[in-house]
């Protein structure tokens, strides 16, 4: 088994876990590409990505171009003479000249079973859609968006209580060892490239804060999925009014679906120690864990202890 000279391109913690797996293997990471440092925290100080931090701890040269389209950036990358580039949640588009630079091309770790959920938010969209199963695909990159030939897939179930955070953690456990298996056998023929069936593909659009607003004209089943899919970001929310008529926005972290009651969508049906029950177009959404603006996360019961007037029975939420 030949050790490969690898350029690793990635940015968040999910990517750093893959970089660590490669560092623990017999392969050589000759350079790391990651997003430029970004302002973070209250002081808006520039913060290095998790991948950059790990690379610097291991004395690996770090490159942070804003784009890979400039000729000098491409020449610099080519001169590294890598066998393969591994891309995990990098955040920049790789032009054809970069894809063609390494001897064995570019590999990507994608957080779904392709061709389902190509695009930016595969983990979140699999929960949002109510999928029972997902996984990770390791593919040979081409110029399309997650359209390359598939080399290896690993599967995992999506539990009924799964959030994007918990599913992300599951895939971060599964994927690095699958990547090492592919790298170890890249030239042995163990993994045969499988074309994607474009007719079976769909696109995982980025999440937005607007989409996170709970819309009572949707079925309760969909809203409960949204709450789990939009955790840890952007977090599902809705608004009610206090006794003075001021809007109060609450984030929702946990809810359950109850049988339908024939009331207008958005009607508060009950609010007690068992939760805050709101009618939807199909089914009742029972809110269990909420967070008022500027306060800590709390149970519905604790919220009602101080703010019961926000949830008058019969009130219709927008």
UniProtKB/Swiss-Prot annotation:
Binding site for (6S)-5,6,7,8-tetrahydrofolate: 112-115
Alphabetical UniProt keywords: Protein biosynthesis, Transferase
Catalysis performed (reactions): L-methionyl-tRNA(fMet) + (6R)-10-formyltetrahydrofolate = N-formyl-L-methionyl-tRNA(fMet) + (6S)-5,6,7,8-tetrahydrofolate + H(+)
Keyword Protein biosynthesis assigned: yes
PROSITE patterns reported in the protein's UniProt record: GART
Pfam families: Formyl_trans_C, Formyl_trans_N
This protein's record includes keyword Metal-binding: no
GO molecular function, one term: methionyl-tRNA formyltransferase activity
EC class name: transferase
CC annotations in GO: cytosol
EC number of this enzyme: 2.1.2.9
Xref: CDD domains: FMT_core_Met-tRNA-FMT_N, Met_tRNA_FMT_C
Role, per record: Attaches a formyl group to the free amino group of methionyl-tRNA(fMet). The formyl group appears to play a dual role in the initiator identity of N-formylmethionyl-tRNA by promoting its recognition by IF2 and preventing the misappropriation of this tRNA by the elongation apparatus.
Family statement: Belongs to the Fmt family.
Protein name per UniProt: Methionyl-tRNA formyltransferase
Originating species: Haemophilus influenzae (strain PittEE)
Organismal lineage: Bacteria, Pseudomonadati, Pseudomonadota, Gammaproteobacteria, Pasteurellales
